[in-house]
Amino acid sequence: MYKSLFTASLLALAIASPIAQAHQAGDIIVRAGAITVQPNDSSSGVKVDRGALAGTDLGGKATVGSDTQLGLNFAYMLTDNLGIELLAATPFTHDVHVKGAALGPANGKLGTLKHLPPTLSLVYYPLDKASAFQPYIGAGINYTWFMDGDTSSRAEAAGFSNLQASNSWGLAAQIGADYMLTDNIMINGQIRYIDIDTQVYVDHNTLEGGVRAKVDVKVDPWVYMVGLGYKF
């Protein structure tokens, strides 16, 4: 659905008449809008990572839910066609579910994790600066910082606690477009794919004197953002 809406928006902008000059070297661009992280996830089975039962395969898999937050985007135009861009956002909160593992009552919603996904990209704008419609492509690097998680009440009642995830470095790619409404104000839409690999950990405080379970998760989300921008 997101991809279809984004494609339709690009087509509408492409046929609109240009009314304002677009980007040029030295411009600073600030964008803000709604940003959605939609995981395209897969995972290993759950295993005991630490404790008396270390190495035990508990089976099952983990999934990560979507979330929408305020997205922020800062760009500096190095030339009329090439810019450097930083993606930021308010912290995302994702539900983590486990299915089919030998975790008893903890199967289902294990808890929630928060993260920040700053992404630095080099962005190329192929059209002349006289065009009000400015599609672009970009590639860069992402660092995803996972904050301490919250274990669900159901999992806590079963003896689980201390839900955490490891931080991640990965590559990112994007397409997007600006449409200048005035010399300074623009509409923006963008799609990104980000490589995020993490390990999710949770402690069990009663089983065999205390153990820790781990599952490797490829989050690999599609990231959608629509909003407004201002050029300085």
Residue map of PLM features:
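Cleavable N-terminal export/targeting peptides
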Residues: 1-26
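Short glycine/proline- and aromatic-enriched beta-strand/turn motifs that initiate or cap beta-hairpins
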Residues: 21-73, 229-231
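Gram-negative (and chloroplast) outer-membrane scaffold detector with strong preference
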Residues: 27, 38, 73-152, 219-232
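Outer-membrane beta-barrel translocator domains and adjoining extracellular loop/strand segments
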Residues: 42-50, 95-105, 147-158, 200-208
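Extracellular loop and loop/strand-boundary signature of outer-membrane beta-barrel proteins
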Residues: 56-60, 103-111, 155-163, 210-216
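Short sequence motifs at beta-strands and strand-loop junctions characteristic
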Residues: 62-68, 112-117, 163-170, 216-221
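Predominantly the C-terminal beta-signal and adjacent terminal strand-loop region
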Residues: 93-97, 182-232
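Transmembrane beta-barrel strand/turn architecture of Gram-negative outer membrane proteins
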Residues: 119-121, 169-179
